[in-house]
A protein has these predicted regions:
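A short helix-loop-beta submotif of the ANL/AMP-binding
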Residues: 133-138
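Short glycine-rich anion-binding loops that position phosphate/pyrophosphate groups of nucleotides
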Residues: 46, 103, 174-178
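Active-site phosphate-binding strand-loop segment of PLP-dependent enzymes
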Residues: 143-192
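N-terminal small-domain helix-loop-helix segment of the aminotransferase-like
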Residues: 10-101
Length: 192
């Protein structure tokens, strides 16, 4: 590997594989370039055109070249805090971080978190490699068809007892594809 000869790479990173979703997307583009008809069911990219009012707004702001605040646009954070306050959540703009996407925000969360991660399976393909990069210990929590791929209080208690008194972060991929869930189920788990 040319990178390994140019610089030393941390051992725990040497066996990381490329993102499977991006690898699949690259493979579909390769097949399409060779004339194959490909039906994409896995990549989370919308097949719908961008609404014209959004395109116009982006064009109006294309000349802005300043770095954004590290927590995101203040006006947007204030608007989100106001919206949450209307729903009885007590956050202000300083409690809110705007990011370029969920994957990046989940990565930052795992960098900051000092504890062990509970990862229900199946889950989004990026969370486990992110944990490896951040040297977080991961405990997989198997879900099953009978429970509609949802966490159950019994399984959560079992894995929590195994981890003990260490801090725990549960990365929940809900609403779960394809089965979905409802807020009441998540509230029940969070109260546990």
């Amino acid at each position: 590997n040319i990178i390994n000869t140019l610089m030393d790479i941390k051992n725990h990173l040497l066996n990381l594989q490329p993102s499977s979703t991006l690898a699949i997307n690259e493979k579909t583009k390769e097949l399409e370039s060779k004339g194959s008809k490909v039906y994409k069911f896995g990549f989370g990219q919308s097949p719908f055109p961008i609404p014209s009012d959004i395109v116009e707004e982006l064009a109006c702001n294309a000349s802005k070249k300043e770095y954004l605040p590290s927590k995101g646009l203040l006006e947007l954070r204030i608007a989100i805090a106001k919206n949450l306050k209307g729903k009885k959540y007590l956050f202000d703009q300083n409690d809110i971080i705007i990011g370029p996407g969920t994957k990046e925000l989940m990565f930052l969360l795992q960098i900051a978190f000092d504890g062990e991660i509970i990862l229900p399976i199946p889950s989004w393909v990026s969370y486990f490699p992110q944990a490896i990069i951040n040297r977080n210990k991961v405990h997989f929590l198997e879900t099953n068809f009978e429970d509609k791929w949802h966490l159950t209080e019994n399984k959560l208690k079992e894995i929590s007892d195994k981890i003990g008194n260490k801090k725990k972060l549960i990365i929940m991929n809900y609403p779960n594809n394809p089965s979905g869930t409802n807020p009441k189920k998540i509230e029940e788990l969070s109260s546990w």
